[in-house]
């Protein structure tokens, strides 16, 4: 139910695909990895990396991103399955996304931004 005040989504993401940076207004988000490994990047308002966190199926890490912190997730393993929990009602993902321009740079395309994120990867 998209109007429910408690939202749980089982998410499947594949390595190598682009998952854009986004900001949730008035919503926090929690990630619990069930299979695979997931990177979480905490960003500034322009998309520059401030922090990196790793969640794996073999650890007990759970990450929560408070509102309105810019962030993105990226699979480390070939694929990742994770439970995402957030307060509702549900809002379409695309409406929360933004185009990254770290340090005032020109707009990155998806590949360039993923290359930029690689510089901060913990693994």
Positions of the model-derived regions?
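Glycine- and acidic-residue-biased ligand/ion/polar-headgroup-sensing regions
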Residues: 26-46
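Double-stranded beta-helix
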Residues: 46-53, 72-123
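His/acidic/aromatic-lined binding-pocket segments of jelly-roll/cupin-type domains
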Residues: 10-11, 22, 28-33, 63, ...
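Short loop/turn positions at the edges of beta-strands in beta-sheet-rich folds
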Residues: 15, 25, 34, 67, ...
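A short glycine-rich, His/Asp/Glu-containing loop-to-beta-strand
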Residues: 1-21, 27
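Tight coil/turn sites that cap or link beta-strands
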Residues: 13-17, 59, 66-68
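Cyclic nucleotide-binding regulatory domains
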Residues: 39-63
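Short beta-strand His + acidic residue motifs that chelate non-heme Fe in jelly-roll/DSBH
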Residues: 20-22, 40-42, 63-65, 71-76, ...
